[in-house]
Amino acid sequence: METRKYEITYIIRPDIEESAKSELVDRFDKILADNGATIADSKDWSTRRFAYPIAKYTEGTYHVVNLTTDSDQALNEFDRLAKFSDDILRHMIVKLDA
């Protein structure tokens, strides 16, 4: 399978402490790396207001990860664990054009 570029955007709940947020980001970056992905960039985008409440929150911190991988294993594991995390309100995985 050929190497493809992906962008993952996820929203972190706004009331999380800064230390817990950086642990969360590190944990999910490690999940991607441990499953064969190469992370090119992982950064906070900004805290933004939502158009509608998500899990009773009206704003959240957006985090963006750019990565490359040649298998779906890293993406599937990220997707599975992000669904269970109460600290991640929403997430989206997008395949970028080569």
Curated annotation (Swiss-Prot):
Keywords: Ribonucleoprotein, Ribosomal protein, RNA-binding, rRNA-binding. Gene3D superfamilies: 3.30.70.60. One of its GO terms (cellular component) is ribonucleoprotein complex. It comes from the Bacteria. GO terms for biological process: translation. InterPro entries: Ribosomal_bS6 (IPR000529), Ribosomal_bS6_sf (IPR035980), Ribosomal_S6_plastid/chlpt (IPR020814), Transl_elong_EF1B/ribsomal_bS6 (IPR014717). GO terms for molecular function: small ribosomal subunit rRNA binding; structural constituent of ribosome. Pfam families: Ribosomal_S6. The keyword Ribonucleoprotein applies. CDD domains: bS6. Binds together with bS18 to 16S ribosomal RNA. Belongs to the bacterial ribosomal protein bS6 family. This is Small ribosomal subunit protein bS6. It comes from Limosilactobacillus reuteri (strain DSM 20016). The gene is rpsF.
